[in-house]
């Protein structure tokens, strides 16, 4: 359940997270392990 940097296909903005992800991962803007636009965590 950790966070990791995503590729260019997975991005999120500070105003909208999750649904804007183009990859099979969900963006976690609240994650502080990386930039808000490149911090993702698996849905599971």
UniProtKB/Swiss-Prot annotation:
Keyword Magnesium: no
GO biological process, one term: response to copper ion
Gene Ontology MF terms: metal ion binding
Keywords tagged on the record: Cadmium, Copper, Metal-binding, Zinc
Keyword flag Metal-binding: yes
Record field: transmembrane: none
Secretion signal span: none
Function per UniProt: This protein binds cations of several transition elements. Thought to be involved in metal ion homeostasis.
Domain statement: All cysteine residues are arranged in C-X-C groups. These are thought to be the metal-binding sites in other metallothioneins.
Entry protein name: Metallothionein-4
Biological source species: Drosophila melanogaster (Fruit fly)
